Amino acid sequence: MKKWLIMSVGLLLCLASCQQGEKRAISDEQLAEVFTLAKYQYVMLDQQLTDSTMPRTVQADGSLRTSDLNWWCSGFFPGALWYIYEFGHSQNISYMAMKQTQKLLPLLDMNTDHDIGFQLNCSFGNAYKLTGNDLCREVLVEGARKLAARMNPTTGVIRSWDFLRKGWKYPVIIDNMMNLELLMVGAQLSGDVELGLVARTHADTTMKNHFRPDYTSYHLVNYDPETGEVLSRETVQGYADESAWSRGQAWALYGYSMMYRETRDERYLAQARGVADMLLKRLPEDGIPAWDLDDPSADALRDVSAAAIMASAFIELSEHTGEAAYMHMAERQLLTMMTPEYLAKPGENGGFLLKHGVGNLPEKSEVDVPLSYADYYFLEALVRYWKHEV
């Protein structure tokens, strides 16, 4: 295994050096080492799956815990495989990525929440960018139309969940900003401008109702579907309703950076910058946030998933603005995640890359464990960094 890893690092380093020649905070050699590890770990994960399962996290005994294909994270594993393929161009990984992507085709027959954006855009979207596959294109357009059908013109937002609890009538979470990319992709591929309009309307309404004056975001806004009135603002997965749940802030940063890329609407850029500048003031020196920015505990758990999402978004925002501070924070976060404290060794961590993710601490679900979406956005951030022109 050690010989295989050394040979793979050498090949990937050659490919990376052709892509970038200037010295940067994260070297081509470091990038190649991570992607070699990723290839090894993800082959290991692939071997443990069935036709109806995807990696989710690890069990208490360290063994792999899988999910069914309906789980909101099901698109992250195939999407991560496409990033590994994009960096190293392994045909074996390409085959594996397409196999895992096509497992998600049954999702087109379901429309029970907003997560079809995560599920399809991260998998079929990445596949289409790299292969131009016609089936992937068709899936993206159909998926976008299903997502758009969840829009209520009265509320001006896409409903997140169909299940109701705690007095919810029409719950919308900040995570939903991420699903808008599927709408923008679907609009571009189909020429259906209505899909893009739905995305813009949701982004505008979220900007109005989800954020506090300091640019921190609530997790959930509950609307009256008949009047559009805001009934409550909550932070379901955070420390308190008025706290800044870290992954929610990451979704906000990423979502508005993406919407600016897709629309060039300066309002979205201003919103992304507001969130980014707030984070620069509140993140710790190593860039890895506590699971909630307002958890007062000195030993509050860190959430590597929030850091990975932020790093990817900071890189994109730095390219939109030319602001060096955003790139420097992304570099700091990535370098920290590449240390042994956070990055697994070959064969460990159930096959996942990153350790110390926090899923839903209030519900004591997936706490201080690897998470598929942490790996996905970590690899995306590294690919974005690799392709970034210095």
Model-predicted regions and their roles:
Residues 21-390:
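Glycan-recognition and catalytic cores of secretory/periplasmic carbohydrate-active enzymes
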Residues 4-13:
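Sec-dependent N-terminal signal peptides
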Residues 15-17:
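C-terminal motif of bacterial Sec signal peptides marking the signal peptidase cleavage site
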Residues 6, 19-21:
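N-terminal hydrophobic alpha-helix used for membrane targeting or insertion
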